[in-house]
């Protein structure tokens, strides 16, 4: 399950989405995430899902690879679903002892789960189709106006990219530690959910040690290559908007306008 996390990974390719400017994908992803928290009806989620699957088709990233990332957060999605299902008051659909399911709770639980799925897939598409170097350059370019007020845009962009890239690295390291512990007789599968959580505690110390070791190796490698911050650095491949980026922005504007109209005039609310 841990190795199934796709957020932070890059899937090599030469699709239309891969060739888009990193800034275009970052801005589109941010607006997409904001829109997901604004949309409030079934048609909005349906249109969002259709647009997302169109982007996936254009990216040529296998659906199996993308949906694999959902298995790692299945428990979070399931917990959110159950929490909304039983904790929201409203018109009662089913009642047994202290458990009550309402129409409003069922609706909110379903759409909250859909929202989480769309958030995870949409965020993964950005990292799967953008090289870490391009992601760093894009973030730095977007944050560069704030450098006039003393904000270290290059350092912040680099930290965010490294943190994002380290997610699959740490998950892979966790998987190795679990297998090593199991080879020594450790049991992480038996018991209830609380017992399983307690069984994971011994993994924290070796995981932290491994994380610090990898961070130290990365720092030494950057220092050996003469890294001294963003000041005075040039780019081998400077970011430049192309015709496809302008088309992508136009499609994004049409999508946002459509979502605004759907959310405003189609009053089939999900909560």
Where are these regions (language model features)?
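Membrane-helix interfacial "entry" motifs
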Residues: 14, 37, 60-65, 96, ...
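Loop-to-transmembrane-helix entry motif
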Residues: 69-77, 113, 117, 207, ...
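Alpha-helical transmembrane segments and their membrane-interface exit regions
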Residues: 51-61, 76-79
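Transmembrane alpha-helix interface motif
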Residues: 1-42, 50-57, 144-151, 155-158, ...
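Alpha-helical transmembrane segments and their helix-start/interface "positive-inside/aromatic belt" motifs
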Residues: 25, 63-74, 248
């Amino acid at each position: 399950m841990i190795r199934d996390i796709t957020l932070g990974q890059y899937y090599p390719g030469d699709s239309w989405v891969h060739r888009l400017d990193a800034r275009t994908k970052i801005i589109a992803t941010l607006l997409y995430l904001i829109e997901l928290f604004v949309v409030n009806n079934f048609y909005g989620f349906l249109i969002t899902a259709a647009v997302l699957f169109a982007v996936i088709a254009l990216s040529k990233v296998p659906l199996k690879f993308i949906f694999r990332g959902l298995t790692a957060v299945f428990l979070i999605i399931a917990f959110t679903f159950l929490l909304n299902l039983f904790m929201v008051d409203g018109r009662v659909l089913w009642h047994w002892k202290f458990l009550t399911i309402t129409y409003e709770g069922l609706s909110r639980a379903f759409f909250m789960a859909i929202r989480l799925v769309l958030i995870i897939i949409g965020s993964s598409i950005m990292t799967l189709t953008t090289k870490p170097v391009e992601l760093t350059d894009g973030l730095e370019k977007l944050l560069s106006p704030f450098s006039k007020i003393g904000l270290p845009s290059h350092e912040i962009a680099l930290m965010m990219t490294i943190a994002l890239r380290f997610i699959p690295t740490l998950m892979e390291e966790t998987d190795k530690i679990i297998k090593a512990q199991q080879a020594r007789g450790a049991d992480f599968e038996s018991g209830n959910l609380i017992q399983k959580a307690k069984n994971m505690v011994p993994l924290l110390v070796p995981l932290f040690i491994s994380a610090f070791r990898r961070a130290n190796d990365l720092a030494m490698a950057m220092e050996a290559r003469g890294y001294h911050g963003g000041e005075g650095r040039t780019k081998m491949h400077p970011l430049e908007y192309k015709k496809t980026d302008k088309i992508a922005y136009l499609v994004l504007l049409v999508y946002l306008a459509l979502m605004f109209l759907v959310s405003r005039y189609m009053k089939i609310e999900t909560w």
